[in-house]
C-alpha cells in the first residue's frame, strides 16, 4: 500500500463536504463524477505508455482480468488454450481456473508446471497468454516486449498484469504491442486502500472486443434505460456498474504525482536503493539464514526486494512494531 498523497485529503474533503453533502446528485455532472473512470484513465495512460482512449479506471484487478481474458478469447476463434505462469499472483490463477471450469472446452497451461518456458507451451491452440510484468513474490522483471512478440508470432493475444510495475517502472503498453492490460492503483500509484483498478484495451481491438460483464455504465445510452444492451463505443464499453466515487476522488492525487515524475529517474534511484538494501542485509544478517529471493541483477528486478528466512512473519511483526513497514508473503 503506497503512502497517502497530501492532496488526497483535499480531494476527499471536497468530495464529501461539498460535492456530496451540498450538491448531492447534481455532482454526477457538475463535479464530473460520471466521467471520473474515463478522466482518471486518461491521466494513467502516459504513466503506462498508452495513447489516449485506451484506459478506463474501473472495478478490481480480478474483475478486469476476467473481462479481458473473456474478451480476448472471443477474438481468438478456433483457439481454446490459456497460458499463464504457475507463480502468478493467486487471484490471476483463480480467475483462469474459473473460466476453464465454466467453459469445458477451454484449457489452461502454466509455465513452470506444464512446461519450462512460454515457447514450449505455444501452439496453434493457444488463444491468450497472460503474464505479470513483475513477479509479486520475487520481484523478477520479465522481458515483456520479447514475450509479446513470441505470443503474436504464435497467433495469440497477450494480456499484461502491471500491478507491481505501474508508477515505479517504465511501462510501454503501446510500444510493446500489448493487446490488453490490467493493473491496480493502491501500490505505486498511491490510490489508497481498495482504490479501483484499471483496464487497457488496445485501440485496434476496441470496436470488436466485448465486455462479458455488460452493465449499465457500459451501455451506449445508459440514461435511455433501454431493455436491451448496446455496448458503448471504445474503452467505455468495458465499464460495468456504478463506480466508487470517493475512492476515485482519493486516487486522483496519486496519479497526478505519477504524471510529474520521470520514471527513468525513479527506476535508477530504485535500483540504487534496492541494491544498497540487499548489500546491507547480506552484510548484517548473513548469520541468520536469510536468503535473497529476488534477482541479483538489478536490470532483472522490479522495485521490490524479497528475502526468505525462518519465522518470517514474526520478524515482520517485530519490524512493524518499530515503525518499519514490510510485507510478509
Predicted regions and their residues:
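Pyridoxal 5′-phosphate
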Residues: 1-329
Amino acid at each position: 500500500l503506497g503512502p497517502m498523497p497530501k492532496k488526497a485529503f483535499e480531494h476527499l474533503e471536497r468530495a464529501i463536504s461539498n460535492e456530496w453533502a451540498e450538491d448531492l446528485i447534481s455532482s454526477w455532472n457538475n463535479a464530473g463524477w460520471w466521467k471520473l473512470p474515463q478522466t482518471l484513465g486518461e491521466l494513467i495512460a502516459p504513466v503506462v505508455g498508452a495513447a489516449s482512449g485506451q484506459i478506463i479506471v474501473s472495478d478490481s484487478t480480478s474483475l478486469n482480468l476476467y473481462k479481458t481474458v473473456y474478451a480476448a478469447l472471443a477474438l481468438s476463434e478456433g483457439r481454446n488454450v490459456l497460458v499463464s505462469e504457475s507463480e502468478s499472483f493467486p487471484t490471476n490463477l483463480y480467475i483462469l481456473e474459473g473460466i476453464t471450469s465454466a467453459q469445458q472446452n477451454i484449457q489452461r497451461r502454466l509455465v513452470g508446471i506444464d512446461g519450462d518456458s512460454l515457447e514450449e507451451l505455444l501452439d496453434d491452440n493457444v488463444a491468450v497468454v497472460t503474464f505479470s510484468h513483475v513477479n509479486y513474490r520475487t520481484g523478477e522483471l520479465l522481458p515483456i516486449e520479447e514475450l509479446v512478440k513470441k505470443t503474436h508470432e504464435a497467433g495469440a493475444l497477450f494480456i499484461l498484469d502491471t500491478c507491481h510495475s505501474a508508477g515505479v517502472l517504465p511501462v510501454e503498453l503501446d510500444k510493446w504491442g500489448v493487446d490488453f492490460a490490467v493493473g491496480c492503483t493502491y501500490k505505486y500509484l498511491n490510490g489508497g486502500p481498495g482504490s479501483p483498478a484499471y483496464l487497457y484495451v488496445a485501440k485496434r481491438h476496441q470496436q470488436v472486443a466485448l465486455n462479458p460483464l455488460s452493465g449499465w455504465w457500459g451501455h451506449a445510452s445508459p440514461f435511455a434505460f433501454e431493455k436491451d444492451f448496446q455496448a458503448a463505443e471504445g474503452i467505455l464499453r468495458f465499464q460495468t456498474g456504478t463506480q466508487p466515487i470517493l475512492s476515485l476522488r482519493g486516487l486522483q492525487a496519486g496519479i497526478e504525482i505519477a504524471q510529474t515524475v520521470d520514471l527513468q529517474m525513479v527506476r535508477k534511484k530504485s535500483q540504487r536503493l534496492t541494491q544498497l538494501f540487499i548489500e546491507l542485509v547480506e552484510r548484517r544478517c548473513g548469520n541468520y539464514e536469510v536468503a535473497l529471493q529476488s534477482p541479483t541483477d538489478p536490470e532483472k528486478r522490479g522495485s521490490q526486494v524479497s528475502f526468505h528466512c525462518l519465522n518470517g512473519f514474526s520478524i515482520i511483526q517485530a519490524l512493524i512494531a518499530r515503525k518499519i513497514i514490510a510485507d510478509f508473503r
